[in-house]
Regions:
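Extracellular structured ligand-interaction cores
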Residues: 39, 67-71, 126-128, 137, ...
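Extracellular or lumenal secretory-pathway regions
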Residues: 1-118
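C-terminal or internal capping secondary-structure element at the end of a domain, subdomain, or sheet
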Residues: 133-167
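Short beta-turn/strand-loop junction motif enriched in small, turn-promoting residues
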Residues: 60, 129, 145-147
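Extended beta-sheet lipid-handling architectures
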Residues: 119-126
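A short, structured loop/turn motif at beta-sheet edges
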Residues: 75-83, 127-138
Length: 167
């Protein structure tokens, strides 16, 4: 689990994308070959809020359909690394942004949070790993909790819960 508000190490998209680059000055993904990409690095917590590692999320987004091909690399020091993949449907967020723009409401808070399972059913996979996860196979799904969307600062207070079942 990670929060974009408190756990972001680095984040990059194409210039003018929904997310502002972090830290300031990090290279943007502006070249045509990678302009549909999203790259984030985050601290990772377990379900109890304990810091357990760090990871990356990489996406290539089809902006016409809001469908993304997404991979995660989760590094848990002393245990190993997990590699996950999924097809992700982010249309709930695209619709929310379009609604905010139409309403000229450029900052929107959600209480309770807007909750979305973005993993397209049957596509979330544990595809391998290292250390104790070296033979890992299984399923995963991503559940997002959106607390605030700020289109002015291009900041989203979003918690990602990554559920993993290994067999």
């Amino acid at each position: 689990m990670f929060s974009t508000a408190t756990d972001t190490i680095a984040l990059s998209t194409a210039s003018g994308g929904l997310f502002a680059p972090f830290p300031t000055g990090i290279p943007a993904l502006d070249e045509p070959e990678i302009a549909d990409g999203f790259l984030g690095a985050f601290k990772i917590h377990d379900i109890h809020g304990n810091l357990v590692g760090f990871g990356t999320e990489q996406e290539v987004i089809d902006f016409d359909t809001a469908i993304a091909s997404t991979t995660f690399t989760l590094t848990l020091p002393g245990r190993g690394t997990l590699m996950l993949s999924q097809i992700e449907d982010t249309s709930v967020y695209f619709a929310e942004v379009e609604d905010m723009i139409a309403d000229e409401e450029y900052i929107r808070s959600f209480d309770p949070p807007l909750v979305a399972v973005t993993t397209v059913q049957g596509t979330g996979r544990v595809i391998g790993g290292t250390g104790e996860f070296r033979h890992a196979r299984g399923r995963m799904r991503e559940i997002d909790y959106l607390y605030e969307a700020n289109l002015i600062d291009r900041a989203f207070n979003l918690t990602d819960l990554i559920q993993v079942k290994i067999w």
